[in-house]
Design a protein with these regions (language model features):
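Conserved donor-binding/catalytic core segment of Leloir-type glycosyltransferases
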Residues: 56-83, 93
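Short alpha-helical donor nucleotide-sugar binding micro-motif in glycosyltransferases
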Residues: 122-123, 130-135
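Aromatic "clamp/platform" in nucleotide-sugar-dependent glycosyltransferases that forms part
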Residues: 141-143
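Short hydrophobic beta-strand element within catalytic cores of glycosyltransferases
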Residues: 160-163
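Nucleotide-activated donor-binding/catalytic signature segment of Leloir-type glycosyltransferases, i.e.
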Residues: 105-126
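Membrane-proximal helix-turn-helix segments that form the acceptor-binding/catalytic region
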Residues: 1-11
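Helix-loop-beta element that forms the nucleotide-linked donor phosphate-binding surface
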Residues: 8, 20-40
């Protein structure tokens, strides 16, 4: 499908320079490839005290990780980094899950529970908007992304963000203090510590 589409379509639309470069390298297609970045809806600023009470979290006192529980998202690195923090009453909240339970997602959930991480499962609507409205920061430690919509959503809520320095995240154009070297748990912990101090 991908190969045929890239070779025979009159035009190809991509969502990031990373994917544009991939198509050029992999399929030698450089002409009539159009870059159109993803957008996100206007943020819905809200509170949901009952939901926060249910989760055991407080406004402004949690780091938010929001994505599918897949190995390439490196949420295990986020948990390891969180355990290194002098976090006080700041918690780590992981919003998301997996569509198909596998060894990685099961291990991640066990690791999270042992570290006292709050797992919300998949969330949307008012619950999701309240998590984005009130987070201390958003973190995305991924090793692979096309163009991370979750990062764009977090930025639309004016959250401080801490993200890996992979090409797709670099393409967003954040200041250098928002990035850490992908896979470096100590560097991730140092960035997070600065945000919560």
């Amino acid at each position: 499908g991908e190969r045929l589409g890239c070779r025979f379509a009159d035009d190809v639309i991509v969502i990031s320079e990373v994917i544009q470069d991939l198509i050029a390298r992999k399929y030698h297609r450089r002409e009539r490839v159009h870059l159109i970045y993803n957008g996100v809806p206007k943020p819905e600023i809200c509170d949901y005290p009952e939901y926060f009470e249910e989760l055991g979290i407080e406004k402004g006192k949690y780091i938010l990780g929001m994505c599918h529980f897949e190995k390439k998202k490196n949420l295990h690195h986020l948990i390891e980094a969180f355990k290194k923090l002098e976090a006080g009453d700041c918690k780590l909240v992981l919003a998301g899950d997996t569509d198909f339970e596998d060894e990685y997602s099961l291990g991640l959930k066990k690791m999270a529970q042992e570290a006292g991480v709050v797992l919300t499962g998949f969330v949307k609507g008012h619950k999701l908007h309240s998590l984005l409205t009130n987070a201390r920061c958003y973190c995305l430690p991924s090793s692979h992304e096309g163009l991370p919509i979750a990062l764009l959503e977090a930025m639309s809520y004016h959250l401080p963000v801490v993200v890996s320095n992979i090409p797709a995240n670099l393409e967003v154009g954040l200041s250098s203090d928002c990035y850490f070297h992908c896979g470096d748990v100590d560097a991730l912990a140092a960035r997070l510590q600065k945000v919560i101090d």
